[in-house]
Amino acid sequence: MLTPTQQVGLILQYLKTRILDIYTPEQRAGIEKSEDWRQFSRRMDTHFPKLMNELDSVYGNNEALLPMLEMLLAQAWQSYSQRSASLKNIDIERENNPDWILSNKQVGGVCYVDLFAGDLKGLKDKIHYFQELGLTYLHLMPLFKCPEGKSDGGYAVSSYRDVNPALGTIGDLREVIAALHEAGISAVVDFIFNHTSNEHEWAQRCAAGDPLFDNFYYIFPDRRMPDQYDRTLREIFPDQHPGGFSQLEDGRWVWTTFNSFQWDLNYSNPWVFRAMAGEMMFLANLGVDILRMDAVAFIWKQMGTSCENLPQAHALIRAFNAVMRIAAPAVFFKSEAIVHPDQVVQYIGQDECQIGYNPLQMALLWNTLATREVNLLHQALTYRHNLPEHTAWVNYVRSHDDIGWTFADEDAAYLGISGYDHRQFLNRFFVNRFDGSFARGVPFQYNPNTGDCRVSGTSAALAGLAQNDPHAVSRIKLLYSIALSTGGLPLIYLGDEVGTPNDDGWVQDSNKSDDSRWAHRPRYNEALYAQRNDPSTAAGQIYQGLRHMIAVRQSNPRFDGGRLVTFNTNNKHIIGYIRNNALLAFGNFSEYPQTVTAHTLQAMPFKAHDLIGGKTVSLNQDLTLQPYQVMWLEIA
């Protein structure tokens, strides 16, 4: 009797044979001698067992698994053989250096193409600015074809192979990516794989009863099954879309976790996996370096559960990862999981998503500004920051999305804080419903049944710049100093670097007025960017401060990697941590001067050089930080 390993080996050899069966003997002989086949075959030998094991754990009893694999790997070979020589070189470079993303040189930016540059041709003209800022990674927010009007900001995709016509063409995107690569900038796009728009060809053909697309989505004849599922589902957008299902014109019901125009894909059908892997390979061959894996928590459904963070979801992502290791190993995955911190980290791994958003740190940065106390942030950095090797956090301050207060209730309780009550405070503080608040945020998706609410707003609005608070600029620089120095890949939400305010016009737009997140999705502010080199302006102070910190980070290997050790400052207002046993970082979250005592610093060297201030400071005496001051001290 064959062992499982032997069985997988036989399947692998069978599939390799089937890939080559379409060729004539002469063609086959040539292919088998080629460098392309040698590399592809080597990668299949390494990664097919992982792919097979993950898919078997999901589809093991499905008779379609083997024929699906046969078609998938034939497609993977075609995709790899058509991959450009330059991309194949990057494949090899990143196989040999999986820590490329952890370099101190890496600094990211993210923007909507239309809002920042008008279209793809306009974005290409902005590359010189991205280089000026120091970016090595650029995330282009959803730019694929989507419904006109409401499209969840582009997250309802009607075609993964067509760019939104208002932005340009696939050819334009290919040119932009090539130009970014020429400038030393990696290209990042969203891979929205939990759902498509209701206008996607697959959705239209599934709804029409096309047998080739049968069961591509969850469509039910009546409410019996949806009612059973809804009992345990969380409402994501309760204001505009209560429940998890939407009714079609013919009376049937379709699963729509997010919005009625976003239909959830049915991954219990293995052909859906194969179809989405094909879209992934298409994007990889455009030159995309990183895929932001959208809504990873939701892709598997199971009756009686929350349909979030299920084991099959992880297995499917690892299977997608294995496909990329075979067909386009240069491509990395970035997880987007805004869930409990215990679950966020489970999506990050070399075989799953190599990098992932750090929503806990983001939320706690704003929490610490509001409370002026670093206890929750210190706790998170101590116990939840360090990741497995070859993986990294994406550390951000703001994004296109709302702020959810994602700290764990049990973490808060350990510090004597009621999670529920503290979230209520934070919501009131950041929407200016709390005495003494400097913030001017906007509430998002208040749920009266649970009391849950999130917050919208740009960094400038939330930090107090809108009302010219004298500390607003320093607050913004402080938050970005943490993102730049805690380890991992820092990400700038473009516009933040010049203090762009909220766009109050969202309430007058019928396609946006029910979604306050549009408040922090403003257009490129030409006047503010024109001020970026003028230190007499807030825009200039923020920009020059961030640009200086980026330059320091990129010139100093002490910022390499992703791990840190927290340093107890014995001052509830000052956060402290050590990077690579060589850099001691301090940040004062108070509007008053704060001190780290000489006694607290007694294990440190007598003197240290402050990389931000450019001065030598004494550590054998009390060290005072001015309001919202940051210090990056070389201690070795």
UniProtKB/Swiss-Prot annotation:
InterPro entries, A to Z: Amylosucrase, Amylosucrase_C, Glyco_hydro_13_cat_dom, Glyco_hydro_b, Glycoside_hydrolase_SF, O16G_dom_2
Annotated positions binding substrate: 152, 195, 262, 292, 400-401, 517
EC number: 2.4.1.4
Catalytic activity line of the entry: [(1->4)-alpha-D-glucosyl](n) + sucrose = [(1->4)-alpha-D-glucosyl](n+1) + D-fructose
CDD domains for this protein: AmyAc_Amylosucrase
The entry's keywords: Glycosyltransferase, Secreted, Transferase
Keyword Transferase: yes
Localization annotation: Secreted
SUPFAM superfamilies membership: (Trans)glycosidases, Glycosyl hydrolase domain
GO terms, molecular function: amylosucrase activity
Pfam families registered for this protein in UniProt: Alpha-amylase, Amylosucrase_C-like
Entry keyword annotation includes Cytoplasm: no
Residue numbers marked as site, Transition state stabilizer: 452
Active site: 294 (nucleophile), 336 (proton donor)
Disulfide bonds: none
GO cellular component, one term: extracellular region
Biological process annotations from GO: carbohydrate metabolic process
The protein's role, per its UniProt record: Catalyzes the synthesis of alpha-glucan from sucrose. Catalyzes, in addition, sucrose hydrolysis, maltose and maltotriose synthesis by successive transfers of the glucosyl moiety of sucrose onto the released glucose, and finally turanose and trehalulose synthesis, these two sucrose isomers being obtained by glucosyl transfer onto fructose.
Quaternary structure annotation from Swiss-Prot or TrEMBL: Monomer.
Family: Belongs to the glycosyl hydrolase 13 family.
Protein name: Amylosucrase
Species of provenance: Neisseria meningitidis
Lineage: Bacteria, Pseudomonadati, Pseudomonadota, Betaproteobacteria, Neisseriales
Gene: ams
